[in-house]
Amino acid sequence: MRTIDKLIAPHLKLAPVLVKRAPTLTLAFDDRRKSRLAATLDSGEEVALLLPRGTVLRDGDVLVADDGGLVRVIAAPEAVLYVRAKDALTLTRAAYHLGNRHTPVEVGADYLKLEFDPVLADMLKRIGATVDQVSMPFQPESGAYGGGHKHGHDETFAEDYALAQQVFGEHHGHEHSHDHEHGHSHAAHEHSHGHDHTHGHDHDHGDHVHDESCGHGHHHHHAHR
C-alpha cells in the first residue's frame, strides 16, 4: 500500500499534463480535513494518507506518494445547504449568525454554503434567507487567523482561538500598561500636592515636636491607602 504524505504548495505550478494524468482521490469535506485516513483512489487502489496535522485538502490539490507518484484531489458532491437572499443585508445577517456558531461556511459572491443541518436551515429561513438542500462540493473558508492552506473549523479552531487570544493579549496588554503607568503618574501628582491623606508609618522628626507650640495647623496621620 502506498503512503501519501506530501501536499504540493498551491503556488508551485506543475505541468498541466502531469496533473491531468495523475490518479484522482475523491473525498467529501469531512474526509478532506483528516490528516490520517485510509482511502481508496478512484482507480480502486487503496492508499494511506499521512499528512501534516491540520492539513485540509481542497479541490484540485496535488499530493505526492512515497514512491514519487502524484494524486489529484477532487471535492466530492455532498448534501449541503445553499443559502441566498433578496438583498446583501439579509445574506450578511445570515453569515453573521453562522459565524457566531462557528459553522464552517463557503462564501460566494451571492451565496453561502454549509453542511446540511435542519436546525440551521430553519434559523436561516426565519431571518429571510432562501435555503435549498442540494448536492454540491463543499469548500468552506479558512480560519480567520490560521491562514496558510488549512481549512475547516475542527482542525483550525484551536489554533485560531490561540492566535486570537494572543492578538487580544498584545493589544489589551499595551492598553493596560498605558493605563497603569498613567494611573501611577496621576496618583503621584496628587500625593505630592495633597495634605489630607494619611500614612501608616511614623516620621521621626528628631527634636521637632508637634504640639501647641509647633505652629502647624494640620496633622500628619499618614497612612497609604
Curated annotation (Swiss-Prot):
GO CC annotations, alphabetized: cytoplasm
Pfam families: UreE_C, UreE_N
Annotated GO MF terms: nickel cation binding; unfolded protein binding
Origin: domain of life: Bacteria
Basic residues composition-biased segments: 216-225
Family membership noted in the UniProt record: Belongs to the UreE family.
Function: Involved in urease metallocenter assembly. Binds nickel. Probably functions as a nickel donor during metallocenter assembly.
Location(s), subcellular: Cytoplasm
InterPro entries hit by this protein: UreE, UreE_C_dom, UreE_N, UreE_N_sf
Keyword Chaperone assigned: yes
Keyword check for Chaperone: yes
A GO biological-process term: protein-containing complex assembly
Residue ranges, annotated region (Disordered): 171-225
Extent of Basic and acidic residues compositional bias: 171-215
Organism: Paraburkholderia xenovorans (strain LB400)
NCBIfam families tied to this protein: PRK13261.1-1 (NF009751), PRK13263.1 (NF009762)
Official protein name in the record: Urease accessory protein UreE
Annotated keywords: Chaperone, Cytoplasm, Nickel, Nickel insertion
